[in-house]
Structures are given as structure tokens and as C-alpha cells.
From Swiss-Prot:
GO molecular function, one term: structural constituent of ribosome
Residue span of region Disordered: 107-129
Record organism: Methanoculleus marisnigri (strain ATCC 35101 / DSM 1498 / JR1)
Cited PANTHER family: 40S RIBOSOMAL PROTEIN S14/30S RIBOSOMAL PROTEIN S11
Keyword terms, alphabetized: Ribonucleoprotein, Ribosomal protein, RNA-binding, rRNA-binding
Function noted in UniProt: Located on the platform of the 30S subunit.
Protein name listed in UniProt: Small ribosomal subunit protein uS11
Classification of source organism: Archaea, Methanobacteriati, Methanobacteriota, Stenosarchaea group, Methanomicrobia
Length: 129
């Protein structure tokens, strides 16, 4: 059996878009990447699970062509002052990567979470409707 080569799949999943980037283990060299707008026509479908599946298949194929057989997954949501839960594409992307033949190592959530709070959008008096 051939030597396994691992990479890191960075999945950024918001409610507006999903972006998948595969890098080497150091994270410095990008192997392949894809976003929702590259696989679907309508803007509203960029964050959908279907778009995430198509992206993951495309990314897995490109990564395998470059010799990467397994990935550690880092899932990220917008975080900070925005939502801390990943969008609908995150789970679908991980499942599709596994089905496309990539070995999945560790799955980690790397959403930036503030330890205090930051000034909310809209300022001190809030959004005036």
C-alpha cells in the first residue's frame, strides 16, 4: 500500500456561502479551493448543502490528483460578532469528502469566539427602525 499523504480541509460555512480550501499540513501551501459561486448559478444557493457536496467532490478530485489521500477537517463559522454556528453546507461538505474517497482524520471547530464581547452592529443605541 502506498504512503498516505495528509492535508487540511478548511471549511468556512456561513448562511450566505460555503468555501472549501485544502492546504498542506502546515497550512501555508494551498492545494485546491472552491466556493459556492463556482458550482451553482443562483446566489441564494451558494450556501446550500447541494453546493457544498459539489464543491467537496471537485476539491477531493483535485486533491487526489495532487497526491493527497486524507484530510483533517477544520470547520469555521463567521464567529466574532456574527453567528457562531456553521451554515448548512458544513455537514454536507464533510460527508461528501468522505464519500469521494478521502480519509477523514480529525474534525475540529475553529470558529473565532471572543472572550469578552465586542461592540454589536448598530452601535450603542441599536438599530432604529
Amino acid at each position: 500500500m502506498a504512503e498516505e499523504k495528509w492535508g487540511i480541509a478548511h471549511i468556512f460555512a456561513s448562511f450566505n456561502n460555503t468555501i472549501i480550501t485544502v492546504t498542506d499540513l502546515s497550512g501555508a501551501e494551498t492545494v485546491t479551493k472552491s466556493s459556492g459561486g463556482m458550482v451553482v448559478k443562483q446566489d441564494r444557493n451558494e450556501s446550500s448543502p447541494y453546493a457544498a457536496m459539489q464543491m467537496a467532490i471537485q476539491v477531493a478530485q483535485n486533491a487526489r490528483d495532487k497526491g493527497i489521500t486524507g484530510v483533517h477537517v477544520k470547520v469555521r463559522a463567521p464567529g466574532r460578532g456574527k453567528q457562531r454556528s456553521p451554515g448548512p453546507g458544513a455537514q454536507a461538505a464533510i460527508r461528501a469528502l468522505a464519500r469521494a474517497g478521502m480519509r477523514i482524520g480529525r474534525i475540529e471547530d475553529v470558529t473565532p469566539v471572543p472572550h469578552d464581547s465586542i461592540r454589536g452592529k448598530g452601535g450603542r443605541r441599536g438599530r432604529r427602525v
